[in-house]
Every structure is written in structure tokens, then in C-alpha cells.
Regions:
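Adenine nucleotide-associated cytosolic modules
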Residues: 1-176
Length: 176
């Protein structure tokens, strides 16, 4: 009961309601995380639904964050879900992290990943980072900045600079 109460008191922000964000949010809601914020500015398309498990054919054309919020509330009534139909920017990301216990990045661009990592380090918010390319997936936990353990590491400790955009295929080209 004590651990369940801690989960219910937690606030997790998820960047991206796509192939990574959908199963992550479903698991967070199912385990009883009490407050979930999802940030995405895309709509559901037919090409999404085979891998984005919160969506179905009737959702095509609807905002991903709205559909995701509905599904999560159906799965776990009583949780709070904030649907933010926006793209995170330098201007809004730090405010978005206020009161957040964990940031989960399921975005599909290095610009967003580095923005999230920098904001997580500035705010001291633990960052769970995921990426996928074809049949390969990567996950990492980054935690540095205020309140982090002394031996914590941020993403820029391993990846100091963003890759050249031309050196990395986009999702459509890479078969994601």
C-alpha cells in the first residue's frame, strides 16, 4: 500500500505519444501513477495504429494527446491526465517540468532529445530516454543537476553535441 501511494502521488511527463510514448503511458496508468502529462503536437494517422497501441482506426485525424488522455482515464479512472497539444521549445520546457518527478522522452528528433536532456539537467529532473531505429531500441536513465546523486550523469556527458541532421535518417526513411 505504501508503494502504491507513492506511485499515485507521482507526476510523470511523457514527451511523444507515438510508438514509444503509447506503451509507456499505458504502463504508467496501469500501475497507478497518479498524474501523467503527455506532450505531442501530432494527429493519429492510419500508418500509426499498428505500433501506437492507444489508438485505433476511429481515431484517425484526432489529436494524439486527446485520444491518449481518454484511453488512460478509461484504463485507470481517478488518475489525472494533462493533454498538452504543443511542441516543447526552449521557451516552455522548464515551466513544463515544474512539479514533475520523472521526465520520459519518447520523441523522435535529436533536437527534442537534447532540449529535454538540457532541461532535465537544469531542473534536476530524472530523465528516462528512449529511442528506436528499425529493430534496435535504446533506453537510458540520465540524472544530473540539482538533487541528483553525486555520480549522476547527464546525456551530454556521453553525447556532448547533437549529430549532424544529415547523418541520421528520419523515422520515415529508417522504417520506424
Amino acid at each position: 500500500p505504501e508503494q502504491q501511494a507513492r506511485l499515485y502521488a507521482a507526476h510523470v511527463l511523457v514527451i511523444g505519444a507515438g510508438g514509444l510514448g503509447c506503451p509507456v503511458m499505458q504502463a504508467l496508468a496501469a500501475t497507478g501513477v497518479g498524474e501523467i502529462t503527455v506532450v505531442d503536437d501530432d494527429v493519429v494517422s492510419l500508418s500509426n495504429i499498428h505500433r501506437q497501441i492507444l489508438f485505433g482506426a476511429p481515431d484517425v485525424g484526432r489529436k494524439k494527446v486527446e485520444v491518449a488522455a481518454e484511453r488512460l482515464r478509461e484504463l485507470q479512472p481517478g488518475i489525472t491526465v494533462h493533454a498538452v497539444d504543443a511542441r516543447l521549445t526552449e521557451e516552455n520546457i522548464l515551466a513544463s517540468l515544474e512539479g514533475v518527478d520523472v521526465l520520459i522522452d519518447g520523441s523522435d528528433t535529436f533536437t527534442t532529445k537534447f532540449l529535454a536532456a538540457d532541461a532535465a539537467e537544469i531542473s534536476g529532473t530524472p530523465l528516462v530516454w528512449g529511442s528506436v531505429l528499425r529493430y534496435r531500441g535504446d533506453v537510458a536513465l540520465w540524472w544530473s543537476g540539482p538533487g541528483a546523486p553525486a555520480d549522476g550523469a547527464g546525456m551530454r556527458d556521453l553525447y556532448p553535441a547533437q549529430p549532424d541532421p544529415d547523418s541520421v535518417p528520419d523515422c520515415a526513411t529508417a522504417g520506424v
